[in-house]
Amino acid sequence: MKALITGASSGIGRDMARNLSKRGYDLILVARDENRLQELKKELEIYKVNIEIIAMDLAIEENCKELHKKVKDIDFLINNAGFGDCGDFTKTDLDKEIAMIHTNIIAYHILTKLYLIDMKKVNRGKILNVASIAGFMPGPLMSTYYATKSYVVRLSESIREELRKENSKVQISILCPGPVDTNFNKVANVKFHMREANSQKVADYAIKQVQKGKFYIIPGIDVKFAKIGAKISPASIVSKITYKIQKRKLQRK
């Protein structure tokens, strides 16, 4: 079995690599930071699996296409690369937001599409798109990030229905955690009001749920309730609540 993991140098991606290597998966690990990838590869060598590292910035569209040309015949795709930013929409950095859209949306879209085509040809394979509970609600003061995760949720939901109608054995799932203790928080320049989940526990839970064939993977009771609350409440109310939460983050920096 072979898995391709993007955003593999830290956080959930790194911890999924640890989980899958213990399960005997050969791994292709992709991230921008080659040094961290080398460290992770060295760590995982004890599991006697084949590990290939690819230092690549997936915010660049051509890199995504090149990755697909280079890496073939995978059984499991984990789209995990991504980052966020926090602040008033008119004050956040435009170039950073464009890079975020390329990483969080376009890279996911390209890799999901190209590898799904491959998987459908052999009628097997798994795709896990790492989204966020943010994908189910509006997110003032993190507007671009929330919008990117909403795209991932809706894209994945739509693909799932297409696969169901075709009776395909290819599986797609979405991981939608709340705050997780990862490098994301430093990049997004925020401190969360909610208690942050342990990234290894989130990764282990996600892999376990994928193996069970689950589509929505939402770690934690409080996060599950947040999804339900966002679904049954008016968007205007959810926006007000989210604004207050994000404001606290900015004040805690």
Where are these regions (language model features)?
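Conserved glycine-rich Rossmann-like NAD(P)H-binding loop of the short-chain dehydrogenase/reductase
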Residues: 23-40
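Conserved NAD(P)H cofactor-binding loop of Rossmann-fold oxidoreductase domains
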Residues: 80-85
